[in-house]
Amino acid sequence: MVCLLILGSLIIYKMFSSFEIEFFPNGRPALDIYKIMVQMIEDYGNDMDEIELEDLKIVYDNKLKEANEFFSNNKDFNDLGIYSYEDYEYKNSSDTVDQKFEDTKWNYLLERKEGNVLWELQELPNIIEFYENRNNRYSVNEGFKKYDERINEIITNRENESILSKIVFDNYNNLIKYFGICIIIGIAFMLTPVFLKDKKDKIDCLQYASKHGRKLFKSKLVAGVISTLIITTIELIILFILYGGNNTSMFFKSNINSVFNDEFWVNITFIQYIGLTVVGIYVIGVITAFISMLISSKANTYIASIGMQVLSLFIIVGLTVTILLNALFIIYIPKYLAFIIYLALIVITVLIIITSSKKEKITDINNESRI
């Protein structure tokens, strides 16, 4: 089963997660936004103030001079009547399509290193404008007092002055989502036979015939939780080894409420957010483990167990990718919704475990009822 777990994990990785590792940042201008913000952190730290904004404008002016010098001495563009970046922008925004210009432009943008400055000049004004209007970009919701209060907090605490690209944030969210799905499915797959195997071999009747045998129910639950922690830890270690190759550690101290990212109910850094998602994965994994083992203890066949597991996994995976991980603390979802769902799942699971444990102690082996 371990081999099948590894094979399944590799398939899920190749189908979903590998793209976020092999193609990050994904294309242009994502690559240029990433590089610009990495340089911004190197120059200004994880937050940028008004003085540093003026310096960024100087960086833009220098890039503009570099582009003008490039165009003034470039025969390919000179033949098209382009001698400055202004000429280039005018031609580029023209409604009339000039195929020779398009071919030359994309040749430099995609194939020549001289085209890098053109990508940077495209994105730098957007970054500067975003930052300048950072306090005016939020919508006003008069009917949602808590939302307005949180937005005011973000502005007052200057959380939105942080440098964190949404490209970087979404990349991590996608990775933790896909690995989370992989962990959930893997745990369910590995723990389904915990009780079924004994019933299939008629060993459960022998267990009920002894006092010690009845205690095996709790022992198996504990063993299942330990297995879950091992599976989750191994998969997370693999995730962060792979994620390390994306080179995003410079953003770890950035506030997640950056003007270049979304808004959240909490004032935390990117690394703290990562830590909370890891805790969430462990909680979700343990809940999945208990549900899978309880279903295994009630079902008589693998087919019946799988049928029951499909619904539970659908619910758990659905909640994981929509609220419990990918939308954790995001402001457009009620503030305590994720916490309430986590708490509800934990309480329900604990109650079921307690009830099932009590039933196991008094189960009559002659009148045992199974699904």
Regions found by a protein language model. Name each.
Residues 2-5, 302-316, 369:
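Central hydrophobic cores of alpha-helical transmembrane segments
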Residues 7-56, 123-198, 218-298, 333-342:
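Secretory targeting signals
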Residues 207-214:
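Short helix-to-coil transition segments within interhelical loops
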Residues 294-298, 346-371:
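Junction motif at the cytosolic side of a transmembrane helix
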